[in-house]
Amino acid sequence: MPYFALIYDMVDDFVARRAAYRDEHLRLARESYARCQLVLAGALADSPAGALLVFNSADATAAEDFARNDPYVKNGVAKQWKVRPWTVVVGNEEPRVRSAGKD
């Protein structure tokens, strides 16, 4: 099944403004993860003004629906978003388990 990257550009004061919507945003993310649509998600580490969410679904609809229903988008915390198809080159459907300290 294809992968799709949902990319958020956040407002400059994202950290302060997200507090009112964070619980609902995380609930939505956990529900999508439980449905096996959302694979992983989080803020971009070099800046709190962006986020990346990776979806695994038949088409871009799951990622687009997530964004349209996300309180961060609805309330202007995410100033814009886009969904891009993502081609996985290394990795597969089977999760790898790593032991601590071993690569």
Go through the PLM ranges and name each one:
Residues 1-103:
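Conserved, structured core segments of small domains
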